[in-house]
């Protein structure tokens, strides 16, 4: 298992895996991931994309200056830590919107699978943050 976090440029340029009118089995796609981190663009609807993310452990502090993110947890326990010290804890079938410009980091408590809806070319800015 690997835990490679892509660069901001690689994240923004991730290609769409499935074209319209293709049925996608998200459970099978998630089960095929053996890495501790994988975030892939499954499909695109207009200017928004659906990402499937598998995460175990921490993702670095960052923000998306011009894109909100909507997270929907499918499996496991998922946390979003905010710069002000709050921690949002989500379980399967819970969702939250993180507004554009919000400094945060995500964490999979064990293996976590979530869906993320965001702008197709959402910019990611990694930031220094002292906890």
Feature locations, PLM:
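Conserved short histidine dyad/triad with adjacent acidic residue
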Residues: 35-36, 49-65
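Short acidic-glycine-tyrosine-enriched beta hairpin
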Residues: 84-100
């Amino acid at each position: 298992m690997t835990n490679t976090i892509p660069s901001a440029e690689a994240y923004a340029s991730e290609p769409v895996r499935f074209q319209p009118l293709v049925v996608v089995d998200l459970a099978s796609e998630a089960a095929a991931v053996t890495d501790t981190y994988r975030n892939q663009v499954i499909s695109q609807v207009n200017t928004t994309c659906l990402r499937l993310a598998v995460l175990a452990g921490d993702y670095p502090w960052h923000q998306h200056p011009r894109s909100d993110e909507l997270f929907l947890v499918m499996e496991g326990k998922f946390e979003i830590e905010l710069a002000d010290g709050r921690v949002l804890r989500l379980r399967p079938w819970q969702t939250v919107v993180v507004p554009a410009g919000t400094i945060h980091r995500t964490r999979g408590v064990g293996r976590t699978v979530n869906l993320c809806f965001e702008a197709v070319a959402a910019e990611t800015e990694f930031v220094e943050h002292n906890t």
